[in-house]
Regions:
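A solvent-exposed beta-alpha-beta segment
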Residues: 12-87
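Conserved beta-strand elements of the Class I
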Residues: 15-19, 134, 163-165
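Short, solvent-exposed amphipathic alpha-helical segments in soluble enzyme
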Residues: 29-36, 106-108, 151, 179
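Short, charged/polar "capping" segments at the starts of alpha-helices
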Residues: 49-55, 97-101, 172-174
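Phosphate-bearing ligand-interacting subdomains
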Residues: 58-122
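Phosphate-binding P-loop
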Residues: 124-130
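Glycine-rich phosphate-binding P-loop
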Residues: 134-151
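ATP-dependent carboxylate-amine ligase catalytic core
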Residues: 154-179
Length: 179
């Protein structure tokens, strides 16, 4: 039975689940949630990457607010996780879902008692004083990496200095991939 009060921790932090696909969710965490003392990210969920459930986003990448890292749990347990962790907000961190899929997830989250939010670029974009070329696609596997390598090669070929960045992906050792 709901009391109508927030289920925040004793420190009055807003408890958050980041709903994602093991990519943008890590990026959103690193750029917005990681250092913000108002929020406590209690878990990531995953649905698109095989065998990622049960892993932990490493403490070494989480910062001081998360000395034990953050667990990655199966998205199909979302409602259970909202109740288990007494979650206040679920933040959508997918980039490749249809409107129907997004709103279905929002309805599930709201029915379980949590707020649903989608982060905009204002809070998650990495700032740069240099010109930027962004390589984006609608789905995983569309060729972003190959396209990025080709663009990098062209720019280097005309004498430009190039730096390529991407959000963390859960393939291999995330700590070793840190820059």
């Amino acid at each position: 039975m709901s009391t109508g009060t927030s289920s925040t921790t004793a420190k009055n932090r807003i408890r958050v689940i980041i709903l994602g696909a093991a990519g943008r969710d890590f990026h959103d965490f690193n750029t917005f949630w990681r250092k913000d003392p108002r929020y406590e990210v209690v878990t990531f969920t995953a649905a698109q990457i095989p065998d990622i459930e049960g892993r932990t986003y490493p403490a070494e990448l989480c910062g001081d607010n998360y000395p034990n890292g953050i667990p990655i749990e199966p998205e199909e347990k979302l409602v259970e996780l909202i109740h288990k962790y007494e979650v206040d907000q679920v933040a959508m961190a997918y980039s490749d879902l249809s409107h129907e899929e997004v709103m279905h997830k929002a309805a599930i989250v709201n029915a379980a008692g949590a707020d649903f939010r989608i982060m905009g670029h204002k809070h998650t974009m990495i700032s740069s004083k240099k010109p930027v070329i962004a390589v984006c696609a609608v789905r995983t596997g569309c060729g972003k990496s190959q396209t990025s390598r080709a663009v990098t090669g062209i720019l280097k070929g005309i004498g430009k200095r190039v730096a390529a960045i991407r959000h963390p992906m859960p393939y291999g050792n995330l700590i070793a991939q840190n820059v």
